[in-house]
Amino acid sequence: MESEVSSDIFIKRQQFDYKESHSLVFTLDAKLDDGEALTKVYTDFIDYKCSSSDEDMPAPSEDIQKDYEPQNSFFGKDTANRFPKPKVANENIHHVHVFDGSRSWSIWEAKEQFYRVCDTLLFYSSFLKSNTRYFHVLDFLYNPVGDNKSHQKMKDDIYMQALADRAELYRKSL
């Protein structure tokens, strides 16, 4: 089952129901500009997570990522953010690296998931509630220049706190 609705908290919602595992719900934060680039990344993100196993939710373990390629070639390292504590960790904020052309496709594609890194990042929160796994896309930082500005944002406590606040607002709205 797939559905799309809007609210003051999110601008898109898609739900996929599976008989033998969790239902998956994907949303885009209402503060995001729903342009063409984000729509493509959001669609690919849904495909990536829908093709992952339940054990790999919300993200594959570091060991799995070091040994295998991702389910969707456009995505690289997928990892939890831990700072500032405790809110970012409590809201289960993650980021995944997204292919941006700053490296050649042949080099990107030849690497296992953990080693596919760049400075274009998709931030999301994830949680499980009533046998449904929720993924809320919080931000997309497109930076093909590769000057590390997106990664520097993760060191900005105010920015990360704002992501955690939006994740908490979404989680509490359900």
Report the location of each language-model feature.
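Hydrophobic/aromatic beta-strand elements that line small-molecule binding cavities or substrate pockets
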Residues: 122-123
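Conserved beta-strand/loop element in small beta-rich adapter and peptidoglycan-binding domains
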Residues: 126
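Basic, Lys/Arg-enriched alpha-helical interface segments
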Residues: 1-118, 129-174
